[in-house]
Amino acid sequence: MLPVKPVWNKLESMARANLGGDFKPGAIEWETIVRAHERIRPRIHRTPVLTSATLDALAGAELFFKCENLQKTGSFKIRGATNAIFSLSEEDAARGVVTHSSGNHAAAVACAAGWRGIAAWIVMPKNAPAVKCRAVEAYGGKITFCEPTVASRAETAARVQQETGAVMVHPYDDDRIIAGQATAAKELLEDVPELDAVLAPVSGGGLLSGTCLGAKGQNGTVKVFGCEPERADDAYRSLTSGVLQKLESSDTIADGLRASLAPRTFAILRENVDGVLLVSEEEIVEATKRIWERMKVVVEPSGAVALAPLLRSSGVSKLRLRKNSEHAKPRIGIILSGGNVELKC
């Protein structure tokens, strides 16, 4: 087992990165999240919170799984995409939307655009899973493939936007996206108010930023941790150095976690996240198998990353949670972010 590598939030000792623009981490207020929830509620599922006695025993904690793998389009991404697209003015919506994504955000944007009756142009890396490409096409998205690098995705999306005149719906560097993603943690804390910590995967940072805001907006004492593959560790490096780091390429099995933090999400996380935990490829596979076998739900490797560090010996103790006199064991929420995986029989 590899040791947990937490990033403890000591902002006063961190160097300040050049974020650009006038964005402030407090720009997304609680009321913004509440309005986003009201906007998307009629169109999405309120996903269940499931438990597993077996996984509780393995982790030495009470685990509460927010099952976004059972969400429409198969991931949490529909929350942010729906909020962003239904926030557009009629004039902007008529132009259509463009985005880049390895799959789940792509499907979410295509789906939400279809609900609003507008066009969606989607840039995807050529190594994106076939199941995710088929989903985008089924929802009516128009796919342009690019090289599997962060730079190629951004450059290709900019070209498609210039050619089409469509509105960019960034996968994570967008207040509307982050506010939408925050509604998953909002629901989790409404259903299970007394949590000691919440763990969520981190890639571009939209979900983790939203989880920080959505959880801590209701419970100021809850800790929030990001979970990230060792082979895609830019969030860990960014938060330890205090300078935004880029992920040039990655070969992790967690294909949904191959993006880098953006200035906006970096700013939010630097102010709010309590740590980032790195996990190995073997640990990701093990967590995925445990969920499939014990909970009988389909989760993709990217979605299972948040369980992985808790299956290590002393994994929970590394979170440094305060003792709760009302509960014998720590109570930890886990965001299962998606379930879009291709089955080959």
Predicted features, each with a name:
Residues P6-C345:
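PLP-dependent amino-acid enzyme catalytic core
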